[in-house]
């Protein structure tokens, strides 16, 4: 079976949508701030973003369901921005980018360090895993047409993970 190379159709790949939503610096920095517990407009300004850009990026993240905008219970004139389940699902991508930056950018580990709450040990590097849990290298991977995949066995749940095409 030959590796799938063409077409790189943007309609069969989740990457263009992800880039439409998150594909610029401020969106990722706002997401990082939200993961660090910031919830208010004034707090987000602390990352060095201009007010107009902040308002625009927050609106976009809310529009795409990454953040939810909620009035504060104690003062209905103020709002909070909180991560949704869709936003929390971006954590592995955020961590992979952070780890890449640590390795190839600054050359030093970031601080603070993200640890496992249970044993307070640093998390492992983000990796690509096979269905059976094996860590895969780039050389272990192959793009194939989704129609070539075997259907799930009887009683086995269908794979609801990423598509097997990309752009």
PLM features per residue range, with description:
Residues 23, 73-94:
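Basic, amphipathic "hinge/linker" alpha-helix immediately C-terminal to the N-terminal HTH DNA-binding motif
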Residues 45-72, 76:
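Canonical helix-turn-helix DNA-binding module
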Residues 1-22, 155-167:
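N-terminal leader segment of winged-helix/HTH proteins
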Residues 95, 99-167:
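C-terminal regulatory/oligomerization modules of transcriptional regulators
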Residues 13-52:
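N-terminal helix-turn-helix DNA-binding core of bacterial DNA-binding proteins
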Residues 1, 8-9, 27, 31, ...:
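Short histidine
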